[in-house]
């Protein structure tokens, strides 16, 4: 029973300290990609920001399990390329 309680507490902690979203560069633009070649590139970019994984979705890198400190789209900055 203690193991089940510890498991649920751990799962709640993961939910509190991680988020999902489109990865944003310092200029406010999303990391772009192509679906054919983008998954491995996006996975690497997302993991560089401590995400659990990433993939190319709608021509931008979508990350799962990002720390709360990492900016995601829509960011407060407008995209200035």
Swiss-Prot record:
SMART domains: Knot1. It comes from the Eukaryota. Disulfide bonds join 29-79, 33-56, 42-61, 46-63. Residues 19-80 form the LCN-type CS-alpha/beta domain. Keywords: Disulfide bond, Ion channel impairing toxin, Neurotoxin, Secreted, Signal, Toxin, Voltage-gated sodium channel impairing toxin. Residues 1-18 form the signal peptide. It is found in: Secreted. GO terms for biological process: defense response. Pfam families: Toxin_3 (PF00537). Its main location: secreted. The keyword 4Fe-4S does not apply. CDD domains: neurotoxins_LC_scorpion. GO terms for molecular function: sodium channel inhibitor activity; toxin activity. Has the structural arrangement of an alpha-helix connected to antiparallel beta-sheets by disulfide bonds (CS-alpha/beta). Binds voltage-independently at site-4 of sodium channels (Nav) and shift the voltage of activation toward more negative potentials thereby affecting sodium channel activation and promoting spontaneous and repetitive firing. Belongs to the long (4 C-C) scorpion toxin superfamily. Sodium channel inhibitor family. Beta subfamily. This is Neurotoxin LmNaTx11.6.
């Amino acid at each position: 029973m203690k193991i089940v309680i510890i498991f649920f507490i751990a799962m709640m902690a993961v939910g509190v300290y991680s988020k999902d979203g489109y990865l944003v560069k310092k200029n406010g633009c999303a990391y772009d990609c192509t679906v054919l070649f983008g998954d491995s590139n996006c996975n690497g970019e997302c993991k560089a920001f401590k995400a659990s994984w990433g993939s190319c979705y709608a021509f931008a890198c979508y990350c799962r399990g990002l720390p709360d400190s990492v900016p995601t789209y829509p960011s407060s900055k407008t995209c200035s390329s």
